[in-house]
């Protein structure tokens, strides 16, 4: 059994995650993870297909989900040598932390404080507990560090479903997820189904309702910038065969295309 695994935590309800999750083009299981959180679990091991490390695959997925969305995405991953997380929130630079297999911190302390700030965690109690995770601790390996991170996040409303725990192999996580009564698939269904899903993702995002429909020069400029950023990002993802980065570029391109189309049909006066 492979000891590589991963999961994605989204700070919103499953019905808000589903439209964007379907665009990842990988079989996923989606379940509630608290009152205002959802968890996405890959059904397979996509990092084995393209030869990319699990952390890069998960960062691409998190970026694709969080681009323009009003909710952040936290990717947790682990393999034989390391474990860590990446937090993506809108167009901000992702922030993450890594531990070696024996639990040795391998990142900057400031990253953990930025993580706490972006999630709105308690600046005293939560930050103090997170700071402990940046200090050497011979009794805690990398996977114990991830479990301690989840313990802190329970105070922010995270409640992982039964059997879903960081550090477990992907196959075991999949078995546990399939046994959950409220888990459901969120998977790629083909290009025809992707169009409405992509539009749903645009509509539900932070950028969806505002710029395209405002009919201002700012909206047009933003749409052009999104197209300019989305095309090379999508091309880079296709060259690297990275589904997450490809979808991130596609979503940016979709945002921009919607804005430009609206500007052409209803030009600004």
What is the predicted function of each stretch?
Residues 9-11, 38-44, 76-78:
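Conserved beta-strand segments of the P-loop GTPase G domain that flank and frequently precede/overlap
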Residues 15-39, 45-47:
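Short, flexible N-terminal segments of the mature chain
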Residues 3-6, 35-38, 70-73:
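Short, surface-exposed beta-edge/turn micro-motifs
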Residues 1-22:
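Short, extreme N-terminal segment that most often corresponds to the first beta-strand
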Residues 1, 31-33, 64-69:
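Short, surface-exposed loop and linker segments with low hydrophobicity and enrichment for Pro/Ser/Thr
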Residues 46-269:
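Charged, compositionally biased boundary regions
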């Amino acid at each position: 059994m492979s000891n590589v695994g991963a999961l994605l935590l989204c700070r919103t309800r499953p019905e808000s995650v589903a439209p964007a999750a379907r665009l990842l083009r990988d079989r996923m299981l989606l379940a509630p993870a608290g009152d205002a959180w959802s968890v996405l679990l890959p059904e397979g091991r996509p990092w084995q297909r393209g030869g990319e490390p699990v952390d890069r695959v998960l960062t691409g997925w998190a970026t694709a989900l969080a681009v323009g969305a009003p909710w952040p995405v936290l990717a947790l991953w682990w393999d034989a040598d390391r474990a860590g997380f990446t937090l993506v929130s809108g167009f901000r630079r992702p922030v993450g932390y890594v531990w070696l297999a024996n639990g040795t911190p391998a990142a900057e302390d400031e990253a953990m404080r930025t993580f706490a700030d972006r999630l709105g965690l308690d600046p005293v109690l939560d930050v103090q507990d997170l700071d402990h995770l940046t200090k050497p601790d011979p009794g805690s390996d990398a996977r114990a560090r991830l479990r301690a991170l989840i313990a802190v996040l329970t105070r922010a409303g995270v409640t992982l479903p039964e059997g879903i725990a960081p550090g477990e192999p992907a196959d075991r996580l999949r078995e546990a997820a399939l046994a959950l009564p409220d888990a459901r698939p969120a998977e790629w269904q083909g290009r025809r189904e992707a169009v409405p899903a992509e539009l749903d993702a645009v509509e539900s995002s932070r950028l969806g309702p505002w710029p395209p429909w405002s009919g201002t020069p700012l909206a047009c400029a933003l749409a052009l910038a999104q197209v300019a950023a989305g095309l090379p990002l999508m091309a880079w993802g296709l060259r690297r065969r990275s589904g997450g980065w490809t979808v991130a570029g596609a979503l940016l391109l979709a945002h921009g295309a919607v804005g430009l189309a609206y500007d052409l049909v209803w030009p600004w006066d």
